[in-house]
C-alpha cells in the first residue's frame, strides 16, 4: 500500500519546533505527487523517497529537521532532543544512515553529547 506521512513543516509544528502553521495541507507519499480535494480543503501529496516516509516520532523528527535545511540551528536540535524519549532517540540515531550527510552528522554529534551516548 501507499505510505502517507505529514510533511516536515507539519512535523516541526507538531513537535513544538516551530510555531508556524503551514498554509497548505501537505503530506509526503510513496505514490505519485498529486492534489486531492477533501470537502473545501485541498491536500497536496508530494512523492518522497522511502527514507523520508518513516513513521512514528523519530520519522517525524527526521522530516522536521530536514525541513529546516542545513541552516538548522544546534539549538533546534537540542530542543528536539530534550523532547524525545530514550527509545525515540535510538530510533532517530538508527534512521540517520539514510539521511543526507549534513543531517546524519548533526544527529551523530547530538547523540554523543552529554554524559551518556545514545547508540542505536
Q: PLM features: what roles do these ranges have?
A:
Residues 36-48:
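A short, charged helix-loop
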Residues 47-120:
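Hydrophobic alpha-helical interaction segments
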Residues 6, 43-45, 53:
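Short hydrophobic-aromatic micro-motifs
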Amino acid at each position: 500500500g501507499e505510505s502517507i506521512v505529514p510533511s516536515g513543516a507539519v512535523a516541526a509544528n507538531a513537535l513544538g519546533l516551530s510555531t508556524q502553521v503551514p498554509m497548505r495541507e501537505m503530506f509526503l507519499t510513496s505514490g505519485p505527487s498529486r492534489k486531492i480535494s477533501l470537502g473545501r480543503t485541498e491536500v497536496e501529496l508530494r512523492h518522497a523517497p522511502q527514507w523520508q516516509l518513516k513513521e512514528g516520532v523519530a520519522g517525524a523528527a527526521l522530516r522536521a529537521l530536514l525541513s529546516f535545511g542545513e541552516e538548522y540551528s544546534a539549538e533546534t536540535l537540542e530542543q528536539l532532543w530534550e523532547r524525545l524519549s530514550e527509545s525515540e532517540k535510538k530510533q532517530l540515531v538508527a534512521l540517520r544512515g539514510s539521511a543526507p550527510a549534513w543531517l546524519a552528522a548533526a544527529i551523530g554529534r547530538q547523540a554523543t553529547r552529554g554524559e551518556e551516548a545514545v547508540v542505536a
